[in-house]
């Protein structure tokens, strides 16, 4: 079975929840619960309230997401999935 296409959205972390989860508000106003991707945990990338993040959402469940990138002030934003390696 092929991997389904994921939706990429950007948002802002509202609060840090227990068990390495985060409450995130998307740019369109929708709120959801997200967790950090495995590589973010592996490289100890910390996410705090107020951070701008890039998320992947499944088209089947829009209430949960995976944080794949944390934007850093002063760095140009990533716009495409093809720029990551």
Swiss-Prot record:
Highest taxon above the source species: Bacteria
Alphabetical list of SUPFAM superfamilies matching this protein: Nucleic acid-binding proteins
Subcellular location: Cytoplasm
Alphabetic keyword roster: Cytoplasm, Initiation factor, Protein biosynthesis, RNA-binding, rRNA-binding
GO cellular component: cytosol
Pfam families reported in the protein's UniProt record: eIF-1a
Domain S1-like: 1-72
UniProt main location, coarse: cytoplasm
Gene Ontology molecular functions: ribosome binding; rRNA binding; translation initiation factor activity
Quaternary structure and partners: Component of the 30S ribosomal translation pre-initiation complex which assembles on the 30S ribosome in the order IF-2 and IF-3, IF-1 and N-formylmethionyl-tRNA(fMet); mRNA recruitment can occur at any time during PIC assembly.
Role played: One of the essential components for the initiation of protein synthesis. Stabilizes the binding of IF-2 and IF-3 on the 30S subunit to which N-formylmethionyl-tRNA(fMet) subsequently binds. Helps modulate mRNA selection, yielding the 30S pre-initiation complex (PIC). Upon addition of the 50S ribosomal subunit IF-1, IF-2 and IF-3 are released leaving the mature 70S translation initiation complex.
Entry-linked HAMAP family: IF_1 (MF_00075)
Entry's family note: Belongs to the IF-1 family.
Protein name as it appears in the record: Translation initiation factor IF-1 1
Species of provenance: Azoarcus sp. (strain BH72)
Higher taxonomy: Bacteria, Pseudomonadati, Pseudomonadota, Betaproteobacteria, Rhodocyclales
Primary gene name: infA1
